Amino acid sequence: LAYKKEMNVNWCTSCKCVLANEEVVNGVCERCGSEVVHRVKSQSMLKITAYADKLIDGLDGLDYIERVATQQKNWIGRSHGAEVNFGTTAGDTLTVYTTRCDTLFGVTYMVLSPEHPILDTWKDKLTNWDDVAAYREEAAHKSDFERSELNKDKTGVRLEGVCAVNPATKEEIPIFVSDYVLMSYGTGAVMGVPGHDQRDWEFATKFGLPIIEVVQGGDITKEAFTLKDDTGIMVNSGFLNGMTVKDAIPAMK
């Protein structure tokens, strides 16, 4: 259950200690007011994700205030999905976690966390490394709360010199580094499906990236089509065309 991990943390430059996200206010330590930066440190962790289902189901039998129980369930999280490997023109592989592998044909870009370790290995391959390094430094001074705020302006830097390869279409797609992707969540890399995720749609619109409809319905020229059930019909998706989302998900695994 317990293990050690090298991970990105909030580091107070004055207290010389790790801070929880709640202890970082507007980029400074709530206790001393000093600047907080991101550092990679060895931390003791609990493997909560391996017990997510048990922990969430166990909350139903506890005499908790409903609000507290809901907060606990949201914090633990329950997610059923798959890891997908994307090749790159650098010869490396990027792994993402997704609950919607049926939308792979609609992936038009990828995004890496500024702390993703693969970026350092690509330093000599990226023609705009100085821009990437400057963006990473800027992100290091933001809290995870600031970075993951849904309504914040989307920022990022496109990597010049390395592309990813969509495993479904075999086409090269651009890779960005953006601070809304956190190294502490998932693999630190996400796939962009702008036709069916609103945050991806906003990012793609800002950077002029293709938006492909792979689940029929809605008007993706105006916003992402985010049908919540699994009855949608697949389009522009090769062998998945005509299937429902429900049937397409297991067909892609």
Where are these regions (language model features)?
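Short acidic-glycine loop/turn motifs at beta-strand connectors
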Residues: 88-91, 114, 167-168
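Short hydrophobic-aromatic micro-motifs
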Residues: 46-47, 95-97, 104-113, 173-177, ...
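Short, solvent-exposed loop/turn segments at secondary-structure junctions
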Residues: 102-103, 117
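Catalytic alpha/beta core of large soluble enzyme barrels
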Residues: 116-223
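Residue patterns forming the tRNA-binding/recognition surfaces of aminoacyl-tRNA synthetases
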Residues: 1-94, 101-102, 189-253
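Short acidic, gly/pro-rich beta-turn/loop elements at beta-sheet edges
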Residues: 106, 185, 245
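Short glycine-rich loop/turn motifs
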Residues: 79-83, 107-108, 159-161
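Alpha-helix boundary/capping residues
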Residues: 59-62, 111, 125-126, 139
